Amino acid sequence: MNKEKLVLAYSGGLDTSVLVHWLAQQGYEVIALCLDLGQKVEDLDAILEKGKKAGAAKVLIENVEEEFVQDYVLPSIQWNALYEGTYLLGTSLARPLISKKQIEVAGREGAVAVAHGATGKGNDQVRFELSYYALNPNIRVVAPWKIPEFYKKYPGRTELLAYAEKYGIPVKASKEQPWSSDENLMHISFESGMLEDPWQAPLPEMFELSQSPKEAPVESQEILIEFLKGNPVAVDGKKFSPAKLLTYLNELGGQHGIGRIDMVESRFVGMKN
C-alpha cells in the first residue's frame, strides 16, 4: 500500500525535525521543504542531512531570496508596516511564501496534505492555514500541535529535546539554550524558553547578526541609497538585486549596532509573547 505524501514546512529546528520523524511514524511519506530565505546562521547542507536522518523521504531546499525581498519585504517597507508600532513582521511576511511553495510542491509531488510546526497558541498557525486554504481549498492540513496525541505527550521543548535524543535526531537547541529562533533576510527573532519571562533580558550571545551598540564604531557612516519606482536599487552608486542589496545593508547595519528590538507581542489568539 502506497503511503500518502505530505509536504512539511521544514526549518531544520527542533520542532520540525521532531515532526519529520513523528509524521513518518504516523504513516506519511514526508517531503520536507526548506526555503532559503537568506538565513545566514543556518547551515542548509546540515539541514538537508538532518531531515534525511529524521526520516524524510525527500528533503527539498529552494532558494527564494529574491522573490521574498521583491514581492514581500519591499512592499512592507513601502507601507512602513510595523505591528504594534515596533515589530518588523519578518516572520509574518515569510509564512505566505512558504505556504505558497508547499502548495506548489504538493501539486508536483501528488501530495494530499501539507503540515506546519506552529503551535495552537501563536500567530503562525493562522498565517499558514489561511494561506494554504486560499491557494488550495481542498488541501488537507496536518497541524500536530493541535492533535491531542502529539501535544499531550510532547507539550514543550523539554519533551521534544528528549524525543530528539531518543531517536538520534541532531538539533541545535539544548536544555542550556532552550529558546527558538526564526531567521530570514528581514530579521532574526528569538522566543520561548527563558524569554517567556519579561524580566529576562536576551543573552549577549543570542545576537548573531549585530554587534552591541556599545562596541559599534564611534564614527558614523554615510551611505546614499538610490530608488527606482519606490524600490531601492543601488547603494553608493553600486547596483544590487533586491536580496543582495538587503544583505549588504543588513551587514552594514549590524556592524553599527542597528536593528535590535526587545518587545512583548500581542498574539492573534489574545496571548502575550
Give residue spans per PLM region.
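Nucleotide-activated chemistry modules centered on ATP-dependent adenylation/adenylyltransferase
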Residues: 1-9, 14-273
